[in-house]
């Protein structure tokens, strides 16, 4: 039984996924490195629950693949290819670019949990259904509302 109630994870650090938090250059040769924050689980034996804990790893980024905020895959490197003792990994590839979220199933771009093409469609429908009746003068609210409902029903029938 350990002295603490927290067990460290048994998952190795050979390959990890995390976000780039800092990019810098080290040494006289100005080797580009990235600080990658990876989450690992720790098990609390008293609560019988896993808790996520963040760890920072320095990784070589020789080809300057990532920018701050990108989600990257890092692999552990052997001691002979390390420029410094605290640089233990190398950036393998960029998994997700920051700000460029694409649904992996459909391949469509996403903004705040909504597909980009659906946002464009809503914008067009609002212009056709809501804004055009408001441009007409001398109509009462009820008449404008009835015209908006008719146009919305016409759009529904046209798209079905």
From Swiss-Prot:
Record's keyword annotation contains Cell inner membrane: no
Compartment(s) of residence: Mitochondrion
Gene3D superfamilies, sorted: Nucleic acid-binding proteins (2.40.50.140)
The keyword Translocase is annotated on this UniProt entry: no
Example GO BP: mitochondrial translation
Gene that encodes it: mrps-17
Assembly, per entry: Component of the mitochondrial ribosome small subunit (28S) which comprises a 12S rRNA and about 30 distinct proteins.
Protein's recorded name: Small ribosomal subunit protein uS17m
Keywords attached to this entry: Mitochondrion, Ribonucleoprotein, Ribosomal protein, RNA-binding
GO MF term list: RNA binding; structural constituent of ribosome
Family assignment from sequence similarity: Belongs to the universal ribosomal protein uS17 family.
